[in-house]
Amino acid sequence: ILASFCREEGDLDAAREIKNKSEQQKNITIIDYDGTNRNQLLEEMSRSIYIIAARFHGTILGLTAGKSVFPILYSDKTKYVLEDLGFHGEYADLRDPDSLSFENAKKNLESGYKIDVTESVQNAEKHFEKLDEFLNN
C-alpha cells in the first residue's frame, strides 16, 4: 500500500507518482487517509510485510502493528520518539540524501528488525487516563 496522510503536503500526488513509476502497479493500493477510513488503513498496514514510512504517523502505526519499519525522517520529532522507543534499526533522513537509498531501505526487512512497543503504548494510555481524570474533575 501507499498511504497518503496529508494531501496538503503532497502525499497523494507522491503516492500516485510512485505507483505510476512502478512495474508492480497492479499490486499497489493507494489509501488516501481522510480521518474516516482509519480501519481500512489499519487493516492494510496489518497485512503488510514491511513498511517504509515517510510520515510520523506511518512510523508509529507500523511499529504498533508489530511490523518491520524503515522510517524516513523529515524532522527531529520522529528521531527523538524512535530513540525513546529504543529503535536501533536503519532509517533515512531527508536532510541527509546519502541515507536514502534502496540498499539502506531494505536492511530492516532483510534483517527482520522489529521492536516491541507494547509497554510504550500501555504507558501512553496511562497518560490519557491521568488527563481524563484531570479534565473530569
Give residue ranges: language-model regions:
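Active-site anion-handling motifs in enzyme catalytic cores
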Residues: I1-N137
